[in-house]
From Swiss-Prot:
This is Myb-related protein A. InterPro entries: C-myb_C, Homeodomain-like_sf, Myb_dom, MYB_TF, SANT/Myb, Tscrpt_reg_Wos2-domain. The keyword Transcription applies. Its main location: nucleus. It is found in: Nucleus. Transcription factor that specifically recognizes the sequence 5'-YAAC[GT]G-3'. Acts as a master regulator of male meiosis by promoting expression of piRNAs. The piRNA metabolic process mediates the repression of transposable elements during meiosis by forming complexes composed of piRNAs and Piwi proteins and governs the methylation and subsequent repression of transposons, which is essential for the germline integrity. GO terms for cellular component: nucleus. PANTHER family: MYB PROTEIN, MYB PROTEIN-RELATED. Component of the DREAM complex. SMART domains: SANT (SM00717). Residues 57-80, 109-132, 160-183 bind DNA. Residues 296-534 are annotated as: Negative regulatory domain. Residues 30-80, 81-136, 137-187 form the HTH myb-type domain.
Length: 728
């Protein structure tokens, strides 16, 4: 048998190597690379091109329309190279592979293949896993293994890797070869294993289906009769389903793990996978059968149960049967074929394992104790356990109509109440989380009126009670009441409050005065009334804050008046688009030190004098330039000097002696009446508002100027020493 399997594997490997035309597709920018298999003509063409050009795969790929360089290289090295050895493995090669695997491990196949001439990594890997691995069984196939392969293949199909997990020591390749070469023909043509599995089926099923309820209760401690309108929990109406499920679980009676097995943990994991696959098979068979699940409370198992034991108990609970009680009309319903494997049969093979034996000691198999339903705890809260369609439901929804029935526990008259759902509940139905009602907590943020008036269940997020805020003063007043403008908060942005999320169908019953966001709304008043002083715009605030952060607090620096004059000249020149000022040529050596302050003030006043172009508009008669220069004095600043145009004052010079100054003062006295007689007339063309304000041409400014001039005319200085300076 082993020799036959070996020859079949070698033949299959060789066939796969010769005719495996599936190559991984390499993406390229231009060539539409083909996914098709390599043809015989393409293989011959590759051989000729390699003989001619060598292993220059760029040149070789140019002769193919839809093949890339990588594809040509892969095809040559893996299939077409004459250096490849495709024959059977020799003893020397096998020994070399074993040594290299012990050295590099069972995953470095590319490195291992470099030490074996003519072999590639794929060949070395398959040789090790299929033949040279000491864990691989080379003995003949047993009938029990055939039964496992048959039942697993019927459930999972050609998933050989999953089936190999159920058979320790057998590889997926060997199982596939055994099925294709031997078992498939026997099962389909000769009826292999079908007679063996069906021989004991009629007597067992007939005895269990025709047994009385008391007999079922004595045999199965988890048997619970329910009402007739509720379908049974684990009833199968078709004999074929019973046969398939029984066949899938018949191998559980055989222990797969020995107590002295060095790979005991691995076997235990494989057994767990076996039970999980059986559970999936049962679920797949139950769903199309149309049977519904009975809602009931389950008992709490101890926390000391391991994960493996929980899987086993799920299997045990899934296959415990529930029968029906005859209906009220007295007609006996047709009993279906049911499947109820014994708990001892399932758990007996596990008693030989120390890990399972310690766990099984925690379970009392006494039927008297297990049949006492009053001893079980039936919680009304949801269990955090993972729910599967075949497990007893751990949760009772408040929306379910619960039915209670009295059950005889062990025939001694003790009754227990078992909760079951309404027959209108669909199969395996579990209400969504969003539809489950929750308990009403007294600490929710409800007003006393709402809490006392109705018992509405909140479906939104509870909101914390907010602290007192001065903004809540707006709640007390009516909408039409006058607001106190002195105590208003200086905020222009409304504060976003937390909204209570509620369903659209829920009516909002909170009084208007208690609304949470009522105090955070900006009142509709004029913003100009909220503050007297102007406020700095936000961009300037940000800029000032950045400057203070970088350079420290800002400080006011007094600038010389000459810089102010230059700024005013620049602004006026930009607005009027004319150069209205004529620079004076100053002779600093002619000015005494005591005149420095007076000259500075004169420069400031000089910038406020009208342009020379406005002389015609005013209609005034001005003096000659030489008369102005004679009447100008550096120590005196008469009022009439303000009305002298700028062009006539540019020839001012410093006097060298006091006598000359006195003479100029007398001339200035003669000039004053002439200047005082100047009448201001209305301008031909009205000035703009800005120019009128800047140049003092408004009506109020003209009146005040005339009154000031008349007032100053009454002042008669007695001497030059008694002159007083008037600084505007």
């Amino acid at each position: 048998m082993a020799g036959r399997a070996r020859s079949e594997d070698e033949e299959e490997d060789g066939q796969f190597t010769e005719h495996d035309y599936d190559v991984s597709l390499q993406k390229g920018p231009k060539k539409p690379w083909s996914k098709l298999r390599w043809t015989k003509d393409e293989d011959d063409k590759v051989k000729k091109l390699v003989e001619k050009h060598g292993e220059d795969w760029g040149v070789v790929a140019r002769h193919f329309i839809n093949r890339s360089e990588v594809q040509c290289q892969h095809r040559w090295h893996k299939v077409l190279s004459p250096e490849l050895v495709k024959g059977p493995w020799t003893k020397e090669e096998d020994q070399r592979v074993i040594e290299l695997v012990h050295k590099y491990g069972p995953k470095k196949w590319s490195i291992i293949a470099k030490h074996l001439k003519g072999r590639i990594g794929k060949q070395c890997r398959e040789r090790w896993h299929n033949h040279l691995n000491p864990d691989v069984k080379k003995s003949s196939w047993t009938e029990e293994e055939d039964r496992i392969i048959y039942s697993a293949h019927k459930r999972m199909g050609n998933r050989w890797a999953e089936i190999a997990k159920l058979l320790p020591g057998r590889t997926d390749n060997s199982i596939k070869n055994h099925w294709n070469s031997t078992m498939k023909r026997k099962v389909e043509q000769e009826g292999y294993l079908q007679d063996l599995m069906n021989c004991d089926r009629p007597s067992k099923l007939q005895a269990k289906s025709c047994a009385a309820p008391n007999h079922l209760q004595a045999q199965n401690q988890f048997y619970i009769p329910v009402q007739t309108q509720i379908p049974r929990y684990s009833s199968l109406s078709h004999d074929d389903n019973c046969i398939e499920i029984q066949n899938s679980f018949s191998f559980i009676q055989q222990p797969f793990v020995d107590a002295d097995d060095p790979e005991k943990e691995k076997r235990i994991k494989e057994l767990e996978l076996l039970l999980m696959s059986a559970e999936n098979e049962v679920r797949r068979k139950r769903v199309p059968s149309g049977s519904s699940l009975t809602w009931s409370e389950s008992y709490h198992m101890g926390e000391s149960m391991s994960n493996t034991m929980s899987h086993l108990e799920e299997q045990t609970h899934d296959f415990y049967s529930l029968d029906e009680i005859p209906n009220t009309s007295g007609q006996q319903s047709v009993e279906d074929k049911i499947l109820a494997p014994e708990a001892n049969i399932v758990l007996q093979p596990l008693e030989t394992i120390p890990e399972f034996s310690e766990t099984l000691e925690l379970i009392d198999v006494d039927t008297v104790d297990w049949n006492n339903i009053e001893s079980f705890e039936l919680p009304f809260t949801a269990s955090p356990a993972k729910h599967t369609p075949m497990k007893w439901i751990h949760e009772i929804s408040p929306e379910c109509a619960l039915n209670s029935c009295l059950v005889q526990a062990d025939g001694r008259g003790s009754a227990s109440r078992v909760l079951s759902s309404s027959p209108a509940m669909p199969k395996f139905y579990s209400p969504p989380t969003i539809l489950r009602k929750k308990k009403i907590h007294p600490d929710l943020s409800l007003t006393p009126e709402v809490r006392d008036a109705s018992n509405v269940v909140l479906k939104g997020t509870p909101v914390k009670t907010r602290q007192y805020s001065p903004l809540q003063l707006f709640r007390s007043g009516n909408v039409q009441n006058h607001l106190n403008l002195d105590n208003l908060p200086l905020t222009s942005t409304p504060v976003c409050g937390q909204k209570i999320s509620a369903t659209p169908l829920q009516r909002q019953i909170t009084p208007k005065k208690d609304k949470e966001n009522a105090g955070f709304r900006t009142p509709t008043i004029r913003r100009s009334l909220m503050a007297v002083t102007p406020r700095t715009p936000t961009p300037f605030k940000n800029a000032l804050a950045a400057q203070e952060k970088k350079y420290g607090p800002l400080r006011t620096v007094m600038q010389p008046l000459i810089f102010v004059e230059e700024d005013i000249m620049e602004v006026l020149k930009k607005e009027t688009e004319k150069d209205v000022f004529i620079k004076e040529e100053k002779e600093s050596d002619c000015k005494p030190m005591k005149q420095e302050h007076v000259s500075t003030v004169r420069k400031v006043r000089k910038s406020l004098i009208l342009d020379s172009c406005d002389k015609e508009e005013l209609g005034a008669d001005f003096l000659a330039p030489d008369e102005v220069s004679q009447s100008q004095n550096g120590n005196t600043l008469p009022t009439s000097f303000l009305m002298i145009p700028l062009g006539e004052r540019q020839d001012q010079k410093c006097d060298e002696n006091t006598d000359t100054r006195k003479g100029s003062v007398m001339q200035r006295k003669n000039y004053i009446p002439a200047t005082r007689n100047v009448k201001l007339q209305s301008s031909v063309q009205p000035l703009c508002e800005w120019e009128a304000v800047v140049y003092g041409k408004t009506e109020d400014q003209l009146i005040m100027t005339e009154q000031a001039r008349r007032y100053l005319d009454t002042y008669k200085p007695t001497s030059s020493s008694g002159l007083r300076h008037l600084i505007l």
